[in-house]
């Protein structure tokens, strides 16, 4: 699961998003992901980065909706989204959609959940 998330954040133009009711933080990839004893670090220490508690990541969900970008989300045990990795310009409902890139991302990341 961690390797799959690492591959996703390493994609060009990946958007790593953390959202709460009051704030949204977004980093642009490709970014490294490092797994420590307790935390995953997305990005580089000393630069903007995100820490995700490894133990809280219970599942990854892949989505390729007809009206949105291809994305992978990390969820906790209750099903709440922790972090979302969306791939820009992969929304088929928009004129700037890169159809070939969308298909490649689906092939690369849309496999086993």
Located regions from the model:
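Surface-exposed, interaction-prone regions used to assemble/regulate multi-protein complexes
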Residues: 1-113
């Amino acid at each position: 699961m961690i390797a799959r998330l690492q591959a996703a954040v390493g994609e060009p133009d990946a958007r790593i998003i953390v959202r709460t009711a009051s704030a949204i933080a977004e980093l642009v990839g490709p970014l490294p992901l490092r797994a420590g004893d307790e935390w995953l670090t997305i990005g580089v220490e000393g630069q903007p980065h995100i820490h995700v508690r490894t133990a809280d990541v219970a599942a990854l969900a892949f989505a390729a909706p007809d009206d949105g970008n291809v994305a992978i989300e990390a969820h906790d045990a209750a099903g709440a989204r922790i972090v979302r990795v969306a791939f820009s310009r992969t929304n088929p409902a928009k004129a700037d959609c890169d159809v070939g890139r969308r298909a490649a991302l689906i092939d690369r990341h849309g496999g086993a959940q």
